[in-house]
Every structure is written in structure tokens, then in C-alpha cells.
Amino acid sequence: MDIPNKVIKGKIALGKICFHKIAFLDRDGTINKDKNYIYKIDDFEFLPGVISGLKKLQQNGFLLVIVTNQSGVARGYYKEEDIEVLHKWMFQELEKSGVSIAKVYYCPHLPDATIEKYRKNCNCRKPKTELYYKAISELKRLYDLD
């Protein structure tokens, strides 16, 4: 029996089996210059070659996902809302160059955090893997992947 191949929204579907590639990227030091606890747009600077590299990944069928530790929240240097504003701006800047980030996942926790709400030894802080599994689960639903 032949299983029809078809392309749907950048994924290849073979019957009910779907394949997708995901590139998991860190933010600070990978996407932007790491200047310690960046949360202001004025402090954010894309690294040279990053935009063209992201384009190449995207053109080769990768969903682009950022996974980043943001302990500045736990330290009280900035708030989660500040990160969200920065990420929204970053998405808009990348979109101008034809680059789409599927989603950003971040860990605001730290075992010895200044802000009690964020003081925990969590499983989402890299190099632990909770955020990666969360991303895969959410993206499977979002892109209807099996």
C-alpha cells in the first residue's frame, strides 16, 4: 500500500507520521552579545552572522526555539515582564529579516535566589532538560505533530 507524501506547513507528512526538525538555541552568547543580565532593548546586540545563520537553519526546515536561563529575575535585577518585552522586540527585529522564532522558553529560577518566589532547585534550569521536553510537547500540539 502506498502512503501519500504531502507537505503541510513546512513538515513532511507520511500518513500520520510527521517529521520536523527543531533547533534549540541559547540566547545570551549565541543570539546576542552576552553583557550580563540583558533585559533592556538598548543593551541587546545581535552577534555578527546570527541572522544569516538563523535564516539558513529555517530554510533547511528547522523550527527555531530559544531556551535560556534568566536568573536576573531571581536575583531581582529585572522582572519577567521585562524579558517578555525584550523577546517581543527581538521577534519583531528578526521578522524584519525573514526569521521566525517558534517560541522562547526561559527559566527564571535560582537555588539561592534573592526573590523567594524564584528560589528553587528546579528542573527547568539548563543544563537540566525540563524546558526542552516542555517545548517538544507544546510544539507537537501547536504544529499538529505526532
Question: What would you call each of these model-derived segments?
Answer:
Residues D42-D43, G76-E81, R119:
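Short, solvent-exposed loop/turn segments at secondary-structure boundaries
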Residues I17-D34, T68:
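Asp-based phosphoryl-transfer active-site loop
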